[in-house]
Amino acid sequence: GLGDVYKRQIEETIDINYKGMVHVAKEAYPYLEKSCGQLVFYTSSSYTRGRMNYSIYSSTKCATVNFVQALAEEWGSLGIRVNCVNPERTKTPMRTKNFGIEPEDTLLKSMDVAVATAKLLVSDLTGQVIDIKLKLI
């Protein structure tokens, strides 16, 4: 839980999951403005409900969604679209490290997430959270 987390771990999670996203958006802005481009960020189901032992992680994922929605409104009049992908449990090295080996048929594959992201990029959506669920693939 939070009481057992080192300050360094808190800062690292916030730096990667929140500040990293903010800095990417800020640095990309001039290019996005010139090209009417778009940004896609990734969240997790933890954004909808805080998870025990994941308070910092969950709160940064919630911040991701709010940041995406705010930027979509802020930059929409410039033709810049900003969205968020929320993949269900996906087989990744980080997931395996945190949860161990899980049955293959219960996890999304990275390619599923990539295909859904590509479909989002060719859509006209902005300010949306796109849920990718195994049963929908």
Question: Which residues fall in each region the model found?
Answer:
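C-terminal helical subdomain
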Residues: 84, 92, 101-137
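Short, small-residue-biased leader/transition segments that mark boundaries at the very start
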Residues: 1-6
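Catalytic loop of short-chain dehydrogenase/reductase
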Residues: 38-63, 68-77, 89
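Hydrophobic structural elements of the Rossmann-like NAD(P)H-binding subdomain
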Residues: 40, 82-85, 95
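Active-site Tyr-X3-Lys motif and surrounding loop/helix of classical short-chain dehydrogenase/reductase
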Residues: 8-15
